[in-house]
Design a protein with these regions (language model features):
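Active-site helix of classical SDR
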Residues: 111, 147
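SDR active-site lid
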Residues: 153, 160-201
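Substrate-binding pocket helix/loop in short-chain dehydrogenase/reductase
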Residues: 87-88, 95-100
Length: 201
């Protein structure tokens, strides 16, 4: 069984890699930082393939899926994503558009391509990492909260469509609250609540 994990170089993606490796899954580790992926692969007790790609780029996203697709691909985990902290009037538009490309377009593309293949086979599992932010409005992180709402609602709708087809393909959204990862540093945010350890999530 093979699993693709995006955003695998740190945080939740890294911990998911360890969890799946312990269950004997062959892993495809994807992130932008190849060196960190190779360091992670060396730590994991399973067969690992490293693909350095920026999933915010549509072409790289499509090429990534083309490289991993096949009958042995059973699991796709869309984990790559980031946030920005600040008032909507002040945050950088280019960074927000990159966030939308990463948090929405990449998830949409990989989910679409994977579910089409999985539906033909009659099995497969897609996990889209959303957030508790997907249930709420998000002053000072407006765009991030909106992207996670998209991920959550897309996943819920797809789950219903598959259920009506009586498909064995499973899709699920993971919606954690604050987690103690690099996300907080990149976003430039400190939460009032202490973040959960990524291993626990």
């Amino acid at each position: 069984m093979k699993a693709l994990i995006t955003g695998a170089s740190s945080g939740l993606g890294r911990e998911m890699a360890f969890a799946l490796a312990e269950r004997g899954c062959e892993l495809v580790l994807c992130a932008r930082r190849e060196e960190r992926l190779r360091e992670l692969a060396a730590e994991l007790p399973t067969v690992c393939h490293v693909i350095a790609a920026d999933v915010s780029d549509e072409e790289e996203c499509r090429l990534l899926y083309s490289a991993v697709r096949g009958d042995d691909l059973e699991i796709v985990i869309n984990n790559a994503g980031f946030g920005l902290f600040g008032e909507f009037l002040d945050t950088d538009l280019d960074e927000e558009l990159r966030m939308i490309d990463t948090n929405i377009r990449a998830v949409h593309i990989l989910t679409k391509l994977a579910v089409q293949d999985f539906a033909k086979r009659g099995h497969g599992y897609i996990l889209n990492v959303a957030s508790s932010a997907g249930f709420l409005p998000g002053p000072l992180m407006a765009t991030y909260y909106a992207t996670k709402n998209y991920v959550l609602r897309l996943t819920q709708a797809l789950r219903e469509e598959l259920r009506h087809r009586n498909s064995a393909v499973k899709v699920c959204a993971l919606c954690p609250g604050p987690v103690d990862t690099e996300f907080n540093k990149v976003a430039g945010v400190r939460f009032a609540l202490n973040g959960l350890d990524a291993k626990r999530v």
